[in-house]
Amino acid sequence: MKMNRRNLGKAGAGGFTLIELMIVVIVIGVLSAIAYPSYQQYVLKSRRGAVKADMVEYAQRAERFHSVNNTYAGYALPFEVSPREGGTVRYNLVFVGDGSSFTITATPDGQQAKDVCGELSVDQANRKTADGELSECW
């Protein structure tokens, strides 16, 4: 059986056309444009959850300090940034306390500043505040 060079490329030739590849690229681009902002909101929310957990833990530590010393003055936060494991700082934490009250405030930093909740705080009576909607932020 003699093969002709003209038939070599046509018999069993497969692959995608340029138009098909461009359609796939466009579909991926559209899906990315829709999904990425939603993903970013979940990332901000998870970082906010981490700092809220830190703030509640530090408030409990401040209460233990108060039960021993009968004052909040002199208590210091074990970590002044979140995440406490290191890495990029997402929140700066500040403790302000006197004899009978305290407030722990978390101020967003860097990319976290885009979070709708903004600054979060908790006090000795477990009153929580936020720059955004309280029910959404706490």
Model features per residue range: what roles?
Residues 40, 44-55:
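Membrane-proximal amphipathic alpha-helices
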Residues 2, 67-138:
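Periplasmic/extracellular, small/polar-rich flexible segments of pilin-like filament-forming proteins
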Residues 54-69:
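N-terminal alpha-helical signal peptides/signal-anchor transmembrane segments
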Residues 1-16:
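N-terminal leader/signal peptides at the extreme start of proteins
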Residues 13, 25, 101:
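Short coil/loop residues immediately preceding or within conserved phosphate-binding loops
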Residues 35, 42, 62:
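Conserved alpha-helical elements of the SDR catalytic core
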Residues 14, 19-23, 44:
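Internal alpha-helical transmembrane segments of multi-pass membrane proteins, especially GPCRs
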Residues 21-38:
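Alpha-helical hydrophobic helix detector
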